[in-house]
């Protein structure tokens, strides 16, 4: 009999089947090597989508500066993306949005943000992850980058005494006017010494903390530089993308703009940010149900699951400046000034090009890297692909940075771009009213859903085209190939599938159902708590939850090699366990980790198995399992849970403390042999590790630190303790000599037994 795969569609709805197509079972692919190519592609796309050649020479940097707003020249094939924003249309949309939300809506939001900003401490900037550090010109953790910037102020002008975000912002604006900036930098000095034995000269590198200084022009470029790197962990894509991290001089201003935008997003019912999880689902459900109330009896809706092409390349900082000017028009002068700084800095940004371009000869036997600074000099060596990327941008490149007045890089101003997107969803004009059409939707950064409402199909077509035209005016390009329309209440939004209600995407949670590998006590309880959480969220039906529980049990038994006492499974561990089980009368009270059977079902998922089996245990067995003085008994408050996407989730540990709650420790003692031989061995290991790390930059390798048997480690420790006791006078010399003799005899016996 042949199996027909289409039978799956009979029992399952389409939206739940979509979730099975995600390849979430393995780890996502990592990106290796130089990010220069991806960065050049992003910059070239931004210049191409401007569809204009209007340029002026920048007075500050003496580089040609392209205009990205109000100057659309190339009007051919407008289906393709365009990044030229019409400012008057943008302000008109913002006005419509304020009218719909009520008079003084923006003013109220900015006042809320202002009270928060005035209290904000500048240490909030340490929350970020990797940040570009302008002193060393590479990425650092956010806290380190902030400390180095504060140190630079100290070296140039004296200690920085401010505490609030505003004082820090003022200092940054002052810094941009300084004629010279001094900062700390680690330099390596080469020291030469002669070896007494061999007479050879030995070179050693010594790190020395020095003070460096740069002039105003150089500092301006460094302050406005945004570093780029290739994005890690992207599924289903052959080409990588570049993501960006700004420096500590731009960060505080963008933080302020995002705070203002967040207050606006919280009050917009079409916005998918800043809430998440179940709260987000409830907000979206309200928007969908309110649509039905607005529709007349002769109207019908079509849902469009939209996809915006090249969102970041078509966003313009100049447009953001105009939008923020409108938002803060009735606010205090302080907020007007503060909100205008970030877009102005982004209008003059420099993008760091990365490590450079790798070239090889025809036979692929030799490889060479052309650094970013020398690309202009050696462009005759480049392939056609790289030449076409580099030559149009050559006039904008200075050393290893490129001037980019337009466009946003990934991860900047997520909230503000959502406000921009929602403003298109609030649009209404006389022509739409006359035809009895309107639209609404949901927006979350570059992801959107459109609900188009009309009375017949031709009007629906016209409404969607109208929406597309409104979006084009402010640089939002709806991709006609990737967007698709469907019947009402059937769409996908930010990986959430909606079909009358939200359908679970179980594939995301699959890795969390497996054995965590902490210890026998915690693992099964953790898996049960995940199944329970997913049942509460409507992600698992009762039958699927039961199946998941059985799979967890099988994997738990396979991991710890413990099988039911009557299963007759043979194995080294089962031999020992079976001998111990013979002494127990009531075998129903045995824990799973001791060869017992599963007692939990779906209704008792929240109760740990130790509690369920407590009454059935033999008294002697119970006293052994719950013995607080047992050295294996240990309790951790939290437990780490791995998921297919996103960071590791930390949850509360609900497991009962028993003798199975042990914690394994690593033996980190050093090799007690001739030091020289060990050093040589370590050097070889270190070399291999370094080679591997240089190829796979995101690999996490712990370099080996030698090996030592436990016997040697104990002997070494005993001698050390005895010597210390003798030195403080706790034991006499004769006792110390006796201890040494005993250890020597033990060492001999150990070596002979080998």
From Swiss-Prot:
Q: Which family does it belong to?
A: Belongs to the influenza viruses polymerase PB1 family.
PTM entry text: Phosphorylated by host PRKCA.
Its Enzyme Commission number? 2.7.7.48
The entry describes its oligomerization and partners as: Influenza RNA polymerase is composed of three subunits: PB1, PB2 and PA. Interacts (via N-terminus) with PA (via C-terminus). Interacts (via C-terminus) with PB2 (via N-terminus); this interaction is essential for transcription initiation.
RdRp catalytic domain: residues covered? 288-484
Spell out the Pfam families in the cross-references: Flu_PB1
Its domain of life reads: Viruses
Catalytic activity reported: RNA(n) + a ribonucleoside 5'-triphosphate = RNA(n+1) + diphosphate
Short sequence motif named Nuclear localization signal, residue ranges: 189-197, 205-218
Which GO biological process categories is it annotated with? DNA-templated transcription; symbiont-mediated suppression of host gene expression; symbiont-mediated suppression of host mRNA transcription via inhibition of RNA polymerase II activity; viral RNA genome replication; viral transcription
Subcellular compartments: Host nucleus; Host cytoplasm
Gene Ontology CC entries for this record? host cell cytoplasm; host cell nucleus
Looking up PROSITE patterns in the UniProt record yields: RDRP_SSRNA_NEG_SEG
User: InterPro entries from the entry?
Assistant: RNA-dir_pol_NSvirus (IPR007099), RNA_pol_PB1_influenza (IPR001407)
Promoter-binding site, as annotated region:
251-258
Provide a Gene Ontology MF annotation, just one: RNA binding
Q: What is this protein called?
A: RNA-directed RNA polymerase catalytic subunit
Q: What class of enzyme is it?
A: transferase
What keywords does the record list, in alphabetical order?
A: Eukaryotic host gene expression shutoff by virus, Eukaryotic host transcription shutoff by virus, Host cytoplasm, Host gene expression shutoff by virus, Host nucleus, Host-virus interaction, Inhibition of host RNA polymerase II by virus, Nucleotide-binding, Nucleotidyltransferase, Phosphoprotein, RNA-directed RNA polymerase, Transferase, Viral RNA replication, Viral transcription
Function text: RNA-dependent RNA polymerase which is responsible for replication and transcription of virus RNA segments. The transcription of viral mRNAs occurs by a unique mechanism called cap-snatching. 5' methylated caps of cellular mRNAs are cleaved after 10-13 nucleotides by PA. In turn, these short capped RNAs are used as primers by PB1 for transcription of viral mRNAs. During virus replication, PB1 initiates RNA synthesis and copy vRNA into complementary RNA (cRNA) which in turn serves as a template for the production of more vRNAs.
